Curated annotation (Swiss-Prot):
Role: Catalyzes the hydrolysis of 4-amino-2-methyl-5-hydroxymethylpyrimidine pyrophosphate (HMP-PP) to 4-amino-2-methyl-5-hydroxymethylpyrimidine phosphate (HMP-P).
Cofactor(s) the protein needs: Mg(2+)
Name of the protein this chain belongs to: HMP-PP phosphatase
Catalytic activity: 4-amino-2-methyl-5-(diphosphooxymethyl)pyrimidine + H2O = 4-amino-2-methyl-5-(phosphooxymethyl)pyrimidine + phosphate + H(+)
Enzyme Commission number(s) from the entry: 3.6.1.-
Top EC category: hydrolase
Length: 272
């Protein structure tokens, strides 16, 4: 029996309309009744996630900003890592050949230079909102991450530019087909989960994890049992072909698996 369960949010626990379904909530609460520790491992900001776990009365550790922050059940910061200031400076002040919008995150929130109301749909359930400002005027110190949102092919070309400029000063990954993230070196959900597991006295082999995107790769590949969503990015399935693929987030597939696992732990699982 696993001791720690880690869940990505968008495309995994959340349905396509970015809501947490009732079946999913029931399954999570059943895990807690079995004394299984929960952690939500997400690219979302900790300010938003505190609202989410408060609204649904969920006791969970938080890995936020794609591994840049870890918070305890009580909201205490257990770990933090920011982009190297020179890397943040380079991203903020370079001229990029892209149509993608730039978004900057720090402990104060989410900042962008142009209104993108379509991006707020993913945050409607929490009310989390960007703040408009000129990114070039933002201090390069204490930047958690920077992300670019736009067309996938455009972002692939941008990734080449960013790699050429940043080299090994940052870690780049796609958290969705339309979102490219610039993160601190060595920062990912898997590394953060290793820190949290050690803090709790667990091994990664005693963890299970669920995800759908390339920012879940390290986490899914490092735990005792990793599960890929049926709606996952093709690149993730190709990178981790040995992991079991479950159903689609639109059908609350995580809850379907967990219910089976809790009721029939010794029987093989099929998403059908």
């Amino acid at each position: 029996m696993a001791k720690l369960a880690a869940f990505d949010m968008d495309g995994t626990l959340l349905m396509p309309d970015h809501r947490l379904g009732e079946q999913t909530l029931t399954a999570l609460k059943r895990l807690r009744e079995r004394n299984i520790t929960l952690t939500f491992a997400t690219g979302r900001h900790v300010l938003e996630m505190h609202h989410v776990i408060g609204e649904f009365s969920l006791d969970a550790f938080l890995i936020t900003g794609n591994g840049t922050r870890i918070h305890s059940l009580e909201g205490e910061e257990l770990y933090r890592q920011d982009l190297a200031p020179e890397a943040a400076e380079a991203v903020l002040h370079s001229k990029w050949d892209t149509q993608a919008s730039m978004h900057v995150f720090n402990d104060g929130g989410w900042f962008t230079g142009q209104a993108r109301p379509e991006l707020l749909k993913a945050h409607a359930f929490s009310g989390f909102h960007y703040q408009l400002c000129d990114p070039k005027r933002m201090p390069a110190h204490h930047v958690t991450k920077i992300c670019f949102c736009g067309d996938h092919d455009d972002l692939r070309r941008l990734r080449i530019q960013l790699n050429e400029t940043l080299g090994d000063r940052a870690f780049l990954c796609f958290s969705a087909m339309d979102c490219l993230e610039v993160l601190p070196v060595g920062c990912n959900k898997g590394a953060a989960l290793a820190v949290l597991s050690q803090h709790l006295g667990f091994t990664l082999q005693e963890c299970m994890a669920f995800g759908d995107a390339m920012n879940d790769r390290e986490m899914l590949g490092s735990v005792g049992r990793g599960f890929i969503m049926g709606n996952a990015m093709p690149q993730l399935k190709a990178e981790l072909p040995h992991l079991q693929v479950i159903g689609d987030c639109r059908h609350q597939a995580v809850s379907h698996f967990l219910t089976h696992w809790l009721d029939n732990p010794d029987l093989p699982y099929s998403p059908e």
